[in-house]
Amino acid sequence: MTRLDQLEKQIARLRRRAEQLNVISGKYWTARRIIFVAGALLALAFCNFAGTTTAWIVAAVLGIVFSIVTIFHTRVRDSLTRNALLIEIKQVQIARIQLQWECLPGIDESRRSDANHPFESDLDITGERSLHRLLDSAVTKEGSERLRSWLLSSRPDAQLIEHRQSLVRELKGHSLFRDKLQLLSAVARISTAGPASSKSGSSHWNSKILVDWIEQSGSKKSLLPTVLFLSILSTLNIVCIVLWALDLIPRIWPFVLVLYMGASYWQHSLIAGAWGELQGLEKALRHFQLVFGYLETRSYQRTPALAEICAPFAEEGKRPSIEMRKLGRLAAALGVRTNPLLSLIVHLIGPWDFFFTYRLEQIKKEIAHLLPRWLDAWHELEALNSLANFAFLNPDYVFPELIAETDRFAARDLGHPLLKPDSKVCNDFALDGEHRIVILTGSNMAGKSTLLRTIGVNLSLAYAGAPVNATHLQTSLFRLFTCIKVSDSVQDGLSYFYAEVKRLQALLAATKTNDRLPVLFLIDEIFRGTNSRERLIGSRSYIRALSEGPSMGLIATHDLELIKLADEIEGVTNYHFREEVHDGRMVFDYRLRPGPCPTTNALKIMRLEGLPVEAP
């Protein structure tokens, strides 16, 4: 059974479950209406025939029954919400397999690609139809950004890559854990309002807003001096009342009470927003608790690597549940203000609100220290979850083997993960000490640019710790640098040719630096922005300069004169794509072959499209 079949089967099961829950929800809804109407009628009847006391008893009993039914109904409705979210998660999984971009979560349109990055724009790592969007299953903005940074790493680290690979392998086999983490994250996002809500319009939730809010709120003046001063006054007031009651002192307690109440009123601005602040903090963190509580209580005996990441949730005395209990007690204490009589009594006894607001300050300081660690672990898990989900959805992909002994890139059945399987042709390809620079020739639309992007995208996946679209891939660590989609810039006053020259100059400069990591370059149509004579001169000189350093890579070109460099420069070799014409149609097999391209097709394409072409 394929992954697609599995997901469709799971969706069918979830839809059957939704139908059952809807039936149950309907029954609870009917029961609530019946109980409400019956309660009102019975209370009225007993009031008229059995007395007010009996009517109140009946109303109370039916009210309790109504509350119990409402609680069960709420649980069913929550189950329906989670079931719907699970169906959505599974449908998005199918969309990732089938590359249905319109069904994938939206992207942050305010986040633009960096034109100066060594490969971001050229390889479609980010953007509307990008590798990042295909992989990204994070709910938080920070989790998504972490995944993005991994895919855009320009200085790969072998130890870090292998560590991520082990985590992704571990997570890949725990689909229930991954689904539940994503589900709870989604529930937290749609349930949270107030300071933790994202207002950006992106599909991601900006959880850092809560951290900023806590840090800003925690910067207020300490209440400790005020609490001590008011505590002394309240204690003095009680002592004066007791001594007056015992006829030991005159009646001075009203003056002390007025002084105490006046001081409390004078300092009230310090705690004016405490109740609303606590409500917002408690509500936000309770929704975080959906995720944190699951990570805190889960057993990690079978997932030791995962246990290391989730360690902040299991530290003794610093668990999220402990902070939740503290906030719960504070909420109950400060909630006294909703009862005017009780509030008056406790405030006469002591500076109730001031003391518990001071305690809120202390707890917020603890949370301000702990929350970033919890969030960091969550964001790390979300990024890893995205890679593991990608591995799960593509079981035929393999994890690359990293080698350090020599500079080498070798792949079997290498394909592009952003191409649909039915239109994808995979090729074997290798770069090593004997074949360091490949001159790639071929006709228009034959597959040259696609091969460059295929190599680059798979290296991006490999260095992020993800599996790659190949049956085998062995690679050293390289600094990837591309020159594929150069464009002019009206804002910067750059022509296309000058923009290309600047890009190629940056690439060449990268190869000349004294760096332990060599450059792997991917260049498409070198110097295409100038005339053929100068392009050929410039291309030959540039390739010679590249050959003098430790770098390696591919250069796709239409200039067949460049294939002669294979006979002139050691380490330069030729590969090509070709095409055939059948029944007046261009046919491409997209198979990579050694040697220079024996054919061209520009004139053929012009003739096929009805353009005039002179006889050669």
Q: Where is each model-derived feature located?
A:
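Alpha-helical coupling/stalk and coiled-coil linker elements that connect catalytic or binding modules
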Residues: 1-443, 450-480, 502-503, 513
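ATPase nucleotide-binding head domains, primarily ABC-like/P-loop NTPase cores
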Residues: 69-70, 257, 266-267, 387, ...
